[in-house]
Amino acid sequence: LNLALKALGYPEHSVDAIREMVGKGARELCLASLKGYFNGNVPEEAFEAVHRGFMREYPHTWQEGTVPYPGIREMLLSLAGEGHPLGVLSNKPHAVTVPLVRHILPEIPFREVMGFSERFPRKPEPDSLLSIVRSWGREPAQVCMVGDSAHDGNTAVNAGTRLILVGWGYSSRSALDA
């Protein structure tokens, strides 16, 4: 994001500021990154320029600093060892999500890794999660979605799955409590 902003002459955001903007997809991230510069009324041409820049850079830079949260690898291996099916559902583009997950968690036997594509609307719409649930031959109430954002929580509620929201991800505790 900062590469796209900097290339267009906008100030960069701190990692903490970006963390608060993440979770609703690239378009919303780019829009949120500009709102402070335009009193909330972001011109379409500014948004489109930043979004184009972000989409051009992200496939080449996602590896920088992308690591699993502490304890995640062990937790996932434990769940897989107990026979629980595991999947990943992200609003990141599918073409980035699959290599990202395979890069940072290569030893985890995910049954499904799904990023955003035109096939389904973005989270919090339930369609993509329900597709995963069906592919596992399960009913929504038999599946638990673990998420780190309000969007994840809303996706689980909309799909009728169980939910665990964790505080170690992108969203602050106060945002999750809301």
Where on the chain are the PLM-derived regions?
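Active-site neighborhood of HAD-like aspartate-dependent phosphohydrolases
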Residues: 1-20
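Substrate-recognition/cap helix-loop segment adjacent to the acidic, metal-dependent catalytic center
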Residues: 6-8, 12, 32-41, 65, ...
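A metal-dependent, Asp-based hydrolase signature
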Residues: 20-60, 70, 78
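Short alpha-helical
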Residues: 25-28, 74, 95-96, 150-151, ...
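Conserved SAM-binding loop
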Residues: 68, 86-89, 145-146, 165
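Acidic, Mg2+-coordinating phosphoryl-transfer loop and its flanking beta/alpha structural elements
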Residues: 133, 144-178
